[in-house]
Regions:
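Surface-exposed acidic, glycine-flexible loop patches that form ligand/cofactor-binding
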Residues: 21-26, 58-59, 148-151
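Conserved SGNH/GDSL esterase-like catalytic core that processes O-acyl groups on lipids
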Residues: 1-54
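Active-site segments of SGNH/GDSL-like serine hydrolases
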Residues: 34-37, 56-88
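Catalytic His-Asp segment of secreted/periplasmic serine-dependent ester chemistry enzymes
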Residues: 75-160
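Solvent-exposed loop/turn segments at secondary-structure junctions
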Residues: 7-13, 36-41, 66, 73-77, ...
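Loop/turn elements at helix/coil->beta-strand transitions in domains of secreted/extracellular proteins
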Residues: 1, 26-32, 61-68, 97-101
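Stable alpha-helical elements in mature extracytoplasmic
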Residues: 11, 15, 19, 45, ...
Length: 160
């Protein structure tokens, strides 16, 4: 069963209090947590972001869920206006501290833009390109999940 809890324009700190109920109700085995953009827009301090992210990941782990943190989307239009790299670094550190996966959407999309795979500077209402970008993101995420599942299966075999 797949469920989605979408909370647009909500900062990480504001999501954390509601996690306990969601986790208790849904009992997920995997949580993919996309966060950070609203925090960057609101200028949330890196340490405050880290604390909220750490609290959220801890709640997910305590509920028995595996965690994938997904960082922000890349946009050359907002690259000079928002400092997302600091919060993306915080996400990487929190993922490492919790032995969680990080899906580096920011890095992937930046690479696609820089290599010309996608022109992410084009009009924001280009729905065909947005669909193709999200399709590729979905495939990359699925690949990471499958790879992680294979690694976990291999670890389980070696510990038996």
């Amino acid at each position: 069963k797949v469920t989605a809890h979408i909370q647009p324009r909500v900062a990480t700190a504001d999501m954390v209090p509601g996690l306990a109920k969601i986790l208790a109700d849904d009992k997920p085995s995997l949580v993919i947590w996309q966060t950070g953009t609203t925090d960057a827009i609101n200028g949330v301090a890196a340490e405050d972001f880290r604390t909220s992210l750490d609290d959220g990941v801890t709640a997910m782990e305590n509920a028995g869920a595996n965690v994938i943190l997904m960082n922000m989307q890349y946009s050359p239009r907002t690259d000079s206006m928002l400092d997302v790299s600091t919060l993306a670094d915080v996400m990487r550190i929190v993922a490492q501290q919790h032995n969680a996966l990080l899906f580096d959407r920011l890095g992937i999309m930046r690479s696609w833009n820089d290599s010309g795979t996608f022109d992410l500077y084009t009009a924001t209402k280009n729905y065909d390109m947005a669909r193709r970008v999200h399709d590729c993101i979905g495939r990359a995420l699925a690949t990471q999940i499958i790879s992680a599942a294979h690694l976990d299966a291999m670890r389980m075999q070696t510990t038996r």
